[in-house]
Amino acid sequence: MKVKGMRWWVLGLIVLVTIINYLDRNTLGIMWAKIVEDLGLINTEGLSEAEFNDLSKKLFRDINMVFMVAYGLSQMFSGKIYDKIGTRRGFTISALVWGISDLLTSLTTGVKGIASARAGLGLGVAGPWPGAVKSNAEWFPQKERAMAQGFFNAGASIGAILAPILIAVIYAAVGWKWTFVAIGVLAPLWVIPWLIVNKKGPKEHPWITDKERDYIISGQPECNVKSDKGLSWGQLLSKRKSYAVILGRFFLDPIWWMFVTWLPIYLGQKYGMDIKQLASHIWIPYVGAALGSLAGGWMSGFFMRKGKSVGFSRKAAILIGASILLPSLVFVAFVQDPMVAVSVMAIILFGYQFTINNIQTLPGDMYTGKSIGSLAGLGGAAATLGTILSMLFIPMLTAGDNWTPFFIMGASLVPLSLICVFLFGGKIEHDALVENNTKQ
C-alpha cells in the first residue's frame, strides 16, 4: 500500500497530539478556583477577597513551579532521548506519561497530590517540542520545515482554544474530577494510530511513494542525508550559534507561558469571570496564535522561494513577528475593557507565534541528524528556566490585582530575545564539518 503525502499524515498526528497536549495542560488553570474551593486548599477565615486572590495566585504559582521544573528537565533530556530512540517511540512514551498523570489528578486530595500529578504531566508534555523539530527535519525538505513547525505550533493554539470550551462543558456535566479522567485518557488512545501510521522514517517507510521520498531527501542538505551521529551537549554548547536558540528562547518563551498559565487567573480576578465566562473569552487570543504560527512558517518559506538564504528568511520573519509582538504587549498593559484586552492579546500571540515558530526551526537549519533534537531540547530547557524565573515575580508584580507590570515585564523580554538571535546566530547554515568529524 502506498499513501500520497505521507509526511502530512505523520505531521497531522503530531498536530493532533499537540492539541491533546494543550487540553491536558489547561485542565488545572481553568478549574483552579473550583478545585481550591472543593478541596479547601486555602483557609478563608478573616481574608478579604484581595488577600484570598493573592494567596490563590501564590499557591497556583508554586504548583506550576513544580510543573515547570519537571517540564524543563524533560525538555533537556527529551531531545537526547528522541535522538537516541527515535520519534516513534519518543512520542509514544511522552503521550502515555502525560495522559496518565493528568488522569491521576482526579484522585488527588491536596496540594502535594496535585503538585505530584503536575510534575508527571510536565515530564510528559515537554517531549513533543524537541520531538516535533526532529520529526520535521526528518520528514520535510528544508523549505517546508518552518511551515510544518507552524502547523505544529498551531496545534498548541487550537488546543488552547478548545480547552476552555471542552473543559467547561465536561465540568458542567460531571464535575472537575471526571473532567481530568475524560481529558487524560485522550493521549493514551492517540498512541494506537500513531504506532500504526508512523512505522519508519521516510527513507524506509513502506507506505511512502518513491516520488515523495525523493522529494524529501533531495530537499534536505546533503550532510543531513549522510549524517548518522550527533554532537554532544558540550560540543553544542561550545558553538556560538547554539545560543541564538538557547538564549533566544530563554527570553521569549516566558511570554507564551505568561498567557497559558496566568490568563484564566487574570480574567477571573480582574474581570470576575467564572468558568462559563472564561470559556466564552479565553479562546480568542489563541486564534491569533494559531494564525501567527501558520503565517510565520509561510513567511520564511516565501522568502526562500524568492531566492533568499535560509538565514535571511528566518531572521526577517523573526523581526516581523517581534515588531507586532512588542507594541501590542505595551498597549494591552493599559487596556481596561475585557473584550478589547482579549482582542489585543490575539495580536500579541499572533506576533509571538510568528516569531517563535522561526526560532524553533533554527536547530534543523544549523545542525543535522541526531544533533537537532538535542539542541531543541537545550533550547526548551533554557526556555523553561526563563519561565520559572519570570514566574517568581508574577505574584509580586500583580499584588492588589494590578496587572500592568505583568505585561510590561513581557514587553521587556522581546528585545532581549532579538538581540540574542541576531548577535549569536551569525550565518545560519548546517555545521556539516563538525558533525562529520564526530564519525572519525
Predicted features, each with a name:
Residues 9-45, 259-264:
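Extracytoplasmic
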Residues 28-30, 237-294, 355-360, 390-391:
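Extracytoplasmic gate region of multi-pass secondary transporters
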Residues 31-73:
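Extracellular/periplasmic helix-loop-helix junction of adjacent transmembrane segments
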Residues 61-80, 283-296:
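Central cavity-lining transmembrane alpha-helices of secondary-active solute carriers
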Residues 73-111:
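Conserved MFS/SLC helix-loop-helix module at the cytosolic interface between two early adjacent transmembrane helices
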Residues 86, 107-113, 124, 141, ...:
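Helix-breaking motifs and short loop linkers at transmembrane-helix boundaries and internal kinks
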Residues 117-156:
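Cytoplasmic helix-loop-helix junction between adjacent transmembrane helices
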Residues 155-205:
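Helix-loop-helix hairpin linking two adjacent transmembrane segments in secondary transporters
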